[in-house]
Amino acid sequence: IAKLCDSDLVIDLTVEGLMHARETAAILKSGARIMTISNEHPGILSRLRPDPAMKEIVRSAVAACRAATRMKVTSPAGTDLTVAMTDIPTVGVWGWTDRPGTLAHWPGGLVVSFPRQASCNGSIVFAPGDINLTFKRYFESAVRCVIRDDFITEISGDGADAQLMKRYLDGFNDPLAFATSHVGWGL
């Protein structure tokens, strides 16, 4: 960790290794920048090169989230989720790190907010063709997740995708596996 803290730039090629590690805060506090290269196929990375225009797009989205009191997410598939947004941390990633003590990942272009406890309620419906990033595959059948006070309380669906998601989360044997950590979207 001391060597990482002494560096100007740390390139992270692990699968979400430093992004969620306890040591990250110390590395960033030292002034080092962490650039995470997402676990994607090289063909995807070659198509998603950093775009200088993305920085301002992300900053505008962050400003909109910080000014919002409520986020309402709906979809034709049936998603209907409400998130309280007042005075919560929101960050954006545009695909590169250009300031000391910051972490970014490539590909970038997203905004993420960290809601207060018991502030996410409703349902999220994953439709066939949506991407399940955890399993790096497309949903083949609809999956509905009911969220009450930040926790998934029900997972339903007719196909294997619902069972796969439920068994995966159950496998942690930890109620926090069903909790909302953050909300956001890609830009």
Language-model features: locations:
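Active-site bordering "gate/hinge" segments
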Residues: 1-144, 148, 163, 174, ...
